[in-house]
Amino acid sequence: MALSMRKAIGVVKDQTSIGIAKVASNMAPDLEVAIVKATSHDDDQSSDKYIREILSLTSLSRGYVHACVTSVSRRLKKTRDWIVALKALMLVHRLLNEGDPLFQEEILYATRRGTRILNMSDFRDEAHSSSWDHSAFVRTYASYLDQRLELALFERRGRNGGGSSSSHQSNGDDGYNRSRDDFRSPPPRTYDYETGNGFGMPKRSRSFGDVNEIGAREEKKSVTPLREMTPERIFGKMGHLQRLLDRFLSCRPTGLAKNSRMILIAMYPVVKESFRLYADICEVLAVLLDKFFDMEYTDCVKAFDAYASAAKQIDELIAFYHWCKDTGVARSSEYPEVQRITSKLLETLEEFVRDRAKRAKSPERKEIEAPPAPAPPVEEPVDMNEIKALPPPENHTPPPPPAPEPKPQQPQVTDDLVNLREDDVSGDDQGNKFALALFAGPPANNGKWEAFSSDNNVTSAWQNPAAELGKADWELALVETASNLEHQKAAMGGGLDPLLLNGMYDQGAVRQHVSTSELTGGSSSSVALPLPGKVNSHILALPAPDGTVQKVNQDPFAASLTIPPPSYVQMAEMDKKQYLLTQEQQLWQQYQQEGMRGQASLAKMNTAQTAMPYGMPPVNGMGPSPMGYYYNNPY
C-alpha cells in the first residue's frame, strides 16, 4: 500500500512538472518536458528515447545547451528523492560523454557564476525509508562527475596553453567519452538568408552562438605528447587522475545500495571509464619512472609520493574490481589486468630520494668569476718645477730598537738511572775509544834520546833467562835477547804507562806458556785436538773457570767477548763448534773401543796433526806460523 501510494505521488509530481514546463517555459518547452520524463520518479531505467531527444535539441544551438543546464540544475536542487537525483546525474553523465563540448563549457560557466550544479554534499533522501546508503551513493556519484569535469577543464587549459596531456584528446574530448552515435538528424530547412543569397555565397547564421559557427571558429591546437611535457604539467595531470580515482573508489555502494538495480545500472558507465583511467595512470607512472633519476630533488619527492599513493589506490582498485565481477557489473573479459606496484620498487625509489637529499645538503660550489680588473689610471706628466721640497722634521727622535726576545730556556732532562732505551756499546765504539786513548797525547820525552839505565830494576813481568843483566854494551843485549825491556823508557800516547802495556802482552804469554802443557784444542777435557808433538793430557780435567785462560797473539782491537757478535759470525762459529763436537764424539767412541786404557789409547788416536780451535795459533814454536797480532820490541 505504501509503495503504490509513493508511485502514485511520484506520477502526480511528474505530470505537474510537465504541465508547468509546457506553460511557463519561454526558451525550450520541449527540452524541459523531455528532461522531466527522463528524470521521473519511477524505479526503472530512463527511456533512451527521451535522452536522445535531449541530445538532439542541445546540438542545435548554445541557447538549448544553456536551457538544458538550467533545467537539470533546478531539478537536482529541488528534489529530495534519490531516484530522481540519480536519474538526473545519469543524464548529466550521458551528456558529458555523448553531448556537445559546449555542455561542459556551460557547466563550467555556471560554476563560475556560483551555481555549483554537481555539488550535492548536503543531499538527503526524504521520500524513502532506509535510504541512507542510496543517498550516500548519490553524493559520491556527484563528486565523481564534478572531479571528472575538473579534469576536463585541466585538459582544456593545457591545450589552450600549447600543451596536451595525451594524443587521444582533441576538440574538447576528455578521453573518457565513448564513441558517439550518429543520432543527430539533418538540420532543418531554413530560409534563404540563412543558407545563402542568390549568388551562392554563404551567409552568417541568424542565431548567435550556433554550434556550427563555433566549431568553424575553433582552432585545432597542436597535441603535445606526454613525454615532452614539463614536470609541473605531468604532476598536475597525475594529481587530477589520482583524485578522480579516489572519487571512483568511493562510489562503491554499501549496505542496501549494493542490491539496488538502479545503482548497478549507474555503476556500469563509471566502471567502464575506470579502465581508461587506470591506463592513463599507468602511462603517467611509466613516464615518471623514466625521468625519475634525472629529476631535481623536489621533483623526485613528488614522484615518489605519487608512486606511494598510487600503490595504495591500485590495491583498493583490485578489490573493487573483484566485487564488480562478483556482482555482475560489466563482463569479466572487459576488465584490464591490474598490476601492483611492488614494495621493492618503492624501496629503490626511497633510497634514491634519500641519497639525493644528502647530496642536496652539500651542493657543489660554483666558481664565481672574478670581476674584470679596472683599467690602470693614466698618469699625467708631472712638472718638476712645481714640486716643492718638504721642510725638515722638527724634534724627530728615532724610535728605540726593539728589545731582543729572550731565548726560551731548554728544560733540563734528568736521565733515568736505569735507562732501558739507551743503546748498548758496540765493539766498534769500544775500539775507537781505545785507539783515542793510545794516540791522543804527545810522548813524554818530547822525542829526545835517553840512555839505558844500568840499574837492576825489573821493568817487565817476564824476563828472558837468556839475557844477562848488568852488561853495559847495549848492542850485545839487543842481539842476545829481544824481549829484555828493562831499559825502555819510551812513553805511549795519552800518558799510558809502557810497563802496564808490556805487562798486558807478557802476562798472556806467561799464562799461555804455563798452561800449554795442559791445554788442548777444545775444552779442558777435550781429546779431539791435542797439541802437536805431545801426548794427551795426563788426566781428564773439567773445563777451566772463566778468566784463567787468555788468548795470545790476538788483535787487541777485536770485539769484546762480552758483546755478542753479529748473526753471520755466530752462524760460522756454530758450524765450527758443530764440526768439533762431531769429531770429539768420534774420538770418544774410538777411545771406548780401545778399552779406555788411558794415555795408551789416546796416543794411538793422536797420529794426525790437528789445528788449534777458534783460530788460536800455537806459541810453543811448533805448527804453522801464527796469524795473530804480535808485539815486537823495537829496541
From Swiss-Prot:
Region entry Disordered, spans: 157-208, 357-412
GO biological process: clathrin coat assembly; clathrin-dependent endocytosis
GO cellular component entries: cell plate; clathrin-coated pit; clathrin-coated vesicle; cytosol; Golgi apparatus; nucleus; plasma membrane
Compositional bias annotation for Low complexity: 165-174
InterPro entries in UniProt: ANTH_dom, ANTH_dom_sf, ANTH_N_plant, AP180-like, ENTH, ENTH_VHS
Molecular function in Gene Ontology: 1-phosphatidylinositol binding; clathrin binding
Modified residues (Phosphoserine): S207
Keyword Phosphoprotein: yes
Subcellular location: Membrane, Clathrin-coated pit; Golgi apparatus; Cytoplasmic vesicle, Clathrin-coated vesicle
Lineage top rank: taxon: Eukaryota
Modified residues (Phosphothreonine): T224
Keywords: Coated pit, Cytoplasmic vesicle, Endocytosis, Golgi apparatus, Membrane, Phosphoprotein
Bias type Pro residues, positions: 390-409
Domain (ENTH): residue spans on this chain: 23-159
Stated name of the protein: Probable clathrin assembly protein At4g32285
Organism listed in the record: Arabidopsis thaliana (Mouse-ear cress)
